[in-house]
Design a protein with these regions (language model features):
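Extended, charge-enriched "interface" segments that sit outside catalytic cores
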Residues: 4, 12, 49-244, 260
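Subset of Sec-pathway N-terminal targeting signals
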Residues: 6-49, 55-56
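Hydrophobic alpha-helical scaffolding
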Residues: 14-17, 32, 89-92, 153-157, ...
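Amphipathic alpha-helical packing elements
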Residues: 99-122, 251, 255-275, 366-369, ...
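Short, hydrophobic/amphipathic alpha-helical packing segments
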Residues: 99-100, 164, 244-252, 335, ...
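Active-site pocket-lining segments that scaffold enzyme catalytic pockets across diverse folds
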Residues: 225-285
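Cofactor-binding active-site loop characterized by glycine-rich and histidine/acidic residues
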Residues: 261-436
Length: 436
């Protein structure tokens, strides 16, 4: 991500000149966050100053500043004798440093500008560090060509205007991507390369687009039919979240293609009837009979239709896979740890227990669907996360989906719902990636 090529780590190089001190500090901070994001030569250089486990970062930064000050005399001497540095002009160009910092800001904070609220109920404040002025740039620089460094766009340099257009397209459209808090460098770099190389778009062929349209139409059609035929009957519809159905279907098909044999789904009320029909294949006639009161329980007093579980088998590219939708109690989120226990038991039964080194457990996949207010507000969510990386309870990873219809039970004002910007911020404690 640095504009300076580090050919040698010595005291006689102009990259350590005083006017680069702030750049080196920023580069070192970047190295501390993600070592793989800087050139390999810089990695080796920084490693010299942090080889001891007791090394203090402030001391290392002070060492860089000392080196920079020591270079001032050399720089003045070169100017007086007419000699020049071996590095190109942009090595010491503060504009280039500003461009790189702007790219990093988009990766860190571009999600703050993403268009996530179709109802426009919560206007978003201007993100200061995504402005040109914050990085000592101006509109006069827009047509200047700069090196793109590690920006994955297929070219080594581009005008600043084009760089900004690409970053806006990747990070600030209708999908917010927040991943810079992830501590695993390979995971972070994979996400960076994937979204930037695709310019923020997932490319589907015609067949896939038709399949998605079919799923969306089925999801929307069911909700409209139930609303019209059973007006006023409680059903916890999926209106506004219909894209959830093709998303879950894609997860199931992809997982099956990778060899997963069972998928266990846990969810609350909203969208449950749609999942029963359009994901697990429950006969719609059976659902309508439940609405009409024609179904009598064999034992006990029965339960409401949006608590019922179901299981079925579906075909995937990897063969037949078993789906199970767990029965749901009315207490929000309590199904999550129950689901994890069910998945772990199924993995043990298949002799496929996962370990903490990310091996095993691939035969059974847990999928948990949350509501936005419950995900942020129910303590059992954090408790389940806390157990997710322990030897006895890990399931090897869970797909979490949050359906946010912007109404948390009886509270619609975000300031009264939670203390964080996103309902998924609680997952940051466990270094999960977030896509909104």
């Amino acid at each position: 991500m640095n504009s300076i090529t580090k050919e040698k780590a010595g005291q006689g190089h102009t990259e350590l000149a005083a006017d680069n001190a702030s750049y080196i500090e920023a580069l070192y901070e970047q190295y501390l966050t993600d070592p793989d994001s800087v050139d390999t030569d810089w990695q080796a250089y920084f490693e010299q100053y942090k080889s001891s486990n007791d090394a203090q970062h402030n001391a290392i930064k002070d060492q860089f500043l000392l080196l920079a000050r020591n270079q001032t005399a050399n720089k003045s001497s070169n100017e007086s004798t007419g000699t020049s540095s071996s590095n190109s002009d942009n090595c010491t160009d503060p504009k280039q440093m500003g461009v790189q910092q702007l790219i990093s800001a988009y990766r860190r904070r571009g999600h703050r500008r993403a268009k996530l609220d179709p109802l426009n109920l919560h206007p978003r404040a201007e993100v200061e560090d995504l402005t040109l002025a914050y990085h000592n740039l101006s509109e006069a620089d827009l047509d200047t060509v700069f090196p793109t460094n590690d920006l994955v766009i297929g070219k080594d340099e581009a005008p600043l205007r084009e760089i900004i257009e690409i970053m806006e397209r990747v990070y600030c459209r209708h999908i917010g991507i927040e991943y810079m808090h992830v501590t695993t460098s390979t995971e972070k770099r994979w996400m960076e390369e994937y979204v930037e190389s695709n310019l923020g778009y997932i490319k589907f062929d015609k067949e896939k687009r038709l399949s998605i349209l079919e799923r969306l139409t089925a999801a929307e059609g069911l909700e409209k039919y139930l609303a019209r035929k059973y007006t006023g009957v409680k059903r916890f519809g999926l209106e506004g979240g219909e894209s959830f159905i093709p998303a879950v279907n894609e997860i199931i098909q992809r997982a099956g293609g990778y060899g997963t044999k069972e998928m266990v789904i846990g969810m609350a009320h909203r969208g449950r009837l749609n999942v029963l029909v359009n994901i697990l294949g429950k006969n719609p006639a059976d659902l309508f009979d439940e609405f009409d009161g024609k179904v009598q329980p064999e034992k006990g007093s029965g339960d409401v239709k949006y608590h019922n579980g179901f299981s079925s088998n579906v075909m995937t590219p990897g063969g037949e896979a078993h789906l199970a939708l767990a029965f749901n109690p009315s207490h929000l989120e309590i199904v999550a740890p129950v689901l994890q226990g069910s998945v772990r038991a199924r993995q043990v039964r298949r002799n496929d227990q996962p370990s903490l080194d990310n091996t095993g457990g691939n035969s059974v996949l847990p999928i948990v669907i949350h509501g936005d207010a419950a995900f942020a507000g129910q303590g059992v969510v954090q408790e389940t996360f806390q157990m997710s990386q322990t030897r006895a309870y890990t399931t090897g990873g869970t797909v979490h989906i949050v359906i946010n219809n912007q109404v948390g039970f009886t509270t619609s004002r975000q300031e009264d719902v939670r203390s964080t910007e996103y309902c998924t911020d609680v997952a940051k404690w466990y270094m999960h990636q977030s896509y909104t």
